[in-house]
Amino acid sequence: MKLRFNIDYRAVYGENIVLNILTGRDDEVRKRVMNTIDGNTWRCEYEPSEKVSRLDYFYSVERDGREVRHEWLVMPHRLDLTSRSAKRYIIFDHWIDIPEDSYLYSSAFTNCVASRKRLEPKDAKYTMSVQLKVRAPQLRTGETLVLIGNGRLLGDWDVARGIHMTEHNYDEWMVTLDVSQLSSPLLEFKFAIINPARPTTPMWENGDNRHVMLPMLKPGDAVVYELSQAYFPLPPAKLAGTVIPIFSLRSEHSFGVGDFGDLKRMIDWVASTGQRVLQVLPINDTTITGTWQDSYPYNSISIYALHPQYIDLNQLPALADKKRMAEFETLRVELNALPQIDYERVNKAKHEYLRELYKQEGAELLKSDEFKEFFAANKDWLVPYAAFCHYRDEYGTASFGQWPDHRTFTPEEFDAMSNARTKLYKEVAYWYFVQFYLDKQMHGAHEYALSKRVVLKGDIPIGISRDGVEAWVEPKYFNLNGQAGAPPDAFSTNGQNWGFPTYNWDVMLADGCSWWVKRFRKMAQYFDAYRIDHVLGFFRIWEIPIDAVHGLLGQFSPSLGMSADEIRGYGLNFQEELMTQPFIADWVIDRVFGPHAGLVRDRYVERVHDDIYRMRPAYDTQRKVEAAFAGKTSDDDIWVRDGLYSLISDVLFVRDRKNPGLYHPRISVQHDFIYEALYDNDKQAFNRLYNDYYYRRNNDFWYHEAMKKLPKLVQATRMLVCAEDLGMVPDCVAWVMNELRILSLEIQSMPKDPKLTFGNLNLNPYRSVSTISTHDMSTLRQWWDEDYELTQQYYNSVMWRGDGAPHPLPGWLASDIVRNHLNSPSMLCLLSWQDWMSIDEKLRLPDANAERINIPANPRHYWRYRMHLTIEQLMQESAFNAKVQELINQSGRL
């Protein structure tokens, strides 16, 4: 069988069009360079080496043997070879870029919101055939695409006689016709949607009739036409949902923390109230110290392993020891009655249960076919993870650089830990056992969500722990001598220092970002949508020196630093030592330290000349100061410590980390002492430089940096892609997100336009997620009472009310705010569970301050918030649930 592929593409001189046939083995492709005589029409022939019934493929553009462009990879072309007698296929394709409605092709829609059963196309026994294919992603559950056209075979424009097409791929429909039954080589037709509830009332596609002129065919020929996408007069889909961490869930069955069983129960509540999305926070293992400090869900020790705290013990076999079962039940009731999570006791108890269960059931489970299948599919990450956990516990620290041995993971260890006959295997197999059950339960929750047509939305953290598996096993991918964070923003005036290592993108890009692709594909096993945490990090990351505590001394990496001559070109007389070393004068010390100024002069700084000082070598970095004040918690000690931090960051420029001859203006330095000491004309010159650097100079550069990375990542899976694009957002972020069809995050109290106090919800882009608050923010009720002047302005200018704003926030007003968000044009309106609860004064938690999940300004925050109601109680609140459903229905959301 020969396949002749044809495609029109206007190439420029030196470019070639390449056919890439996917083999089904990872990302392997077979390439065929196509031929052309006019630079516009390209063709090539391909003869499959083995008997195949289906081919998936895409086209790309190459120059000098290097790919410079390719089609949208999420939905490659699909050719079903359904004509049994065909000896030659003639295929007419068209180039497919990422469509404007790419979200409809995501698994969030095809598997959840508009799930339909796809069928294998039937074989055709025609001597000559024509296959028509069209993409029609707007169809809803239960609907069918019908081809209706001229001639008897196409139904003579009679809907009842139209040809029902087969959905052979997600949102792509096909039909194979017998050419001998056609009355004319000219086909004229249109597509229509048939809803089984209204079978005689078709919805016709937009536009004129379609026409296809068949070429001269001979027996054994099959011609295939890939047609342009069909569009129908349907409003864009809009969905509502809830955001809540899994650890915050509470049910009658919980063991002091939300688990994967509770996730199923929460899916029930979401579905029962007309919501279609449930968003959670990261669920990967974060066990570093074994203390409550591990409660931070964004500092995972593995990008694959799930956190053991989420295991639902009720889904596991019971312990044979009934006395121990009774003891665990007593402890479960006690922990579940607490208003917040006791992270340490919960995790200790769950591991005790799992250890005992492993002794009882482990040997049999590890021999089962189900486990062997799981192990074979996951051993590449599972074995290093188990080894890391084993050595972490053996040596009493996750800092592998401090281990007396095994500071690197060897292939020999991998082999030994993969072989069930070795002693090492038996030592680490407990972790295989735990991850097997976690994976099984999370898969079960995902399948349950699909059955309820609820989209599970996950969260991809921007960073990884420097004391984790990936840093241990794959250090080449990371810059372990730096720290990732964020510049100052509404969450933290000193910036944020997350402590994560930054990525070595040169190495990652060299292998096609395989590390990221595998990470996303693993996540797609559990979720159908995801949030990219801090998407700005793919443009540039805020990189902080390893010896810094706060984020103020960071710089964007990569970015275009400034030379001394460039700085002078803005009218600022650059003086390297003065402007790159901490500016410490007598008046600065007096203002910062007040009654402690004398102590600081005597102990922590030394005089350089006149009234100018420098830090003593023992305290000249923030990490040294941190170590000196470790364990000192008095108000005076904290005053001095934080004051020393501020002295060290009081510089006008920071040196480029890679090129010491380049400089970056220190972020937010306009609020610091060295800026205050400048002459007015120098301040003006610096501000010109500062604004150009942060908002214009790097825009094109950062755009190209993001486009090296993000296209590969967002096309690695079919999950719906959303991004957290808050903070210091350069213009290029919107360019990339629009180009890649990534949903933005819109928060009315944090508008993208810096000239506005509040965003206009009616101007939200459709491709966006609208929310009131995130886990890093005050809840709606907290925010309402934090700044009376601000909320009065909101009450008057946004809610259009002329009287005084009521405090605390009444339920009726919370309902109006929720309604406004639901009515926005945003595709998704996802509200925190706390903000949903704010509409009911009887049900909501009396203490609004107890609803806060995280305080970003506090790097040692304890993440322990839990629902104050059980999910079972929530399901029984019929009036509240009816109100939620009414608000959603009135907004027109599905």
Label the predicted regions.
Residues R88-Y89, D221:
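Terminal low-complexity/IDR "tail" segments
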Residues N6, N20, S60, D80, ...:
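Residues in well-ordered beta-strands of folded domains
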Residues Y9, T23, A136-Q138, G149-G151, ...:
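Generic secondary-structure microfeatures
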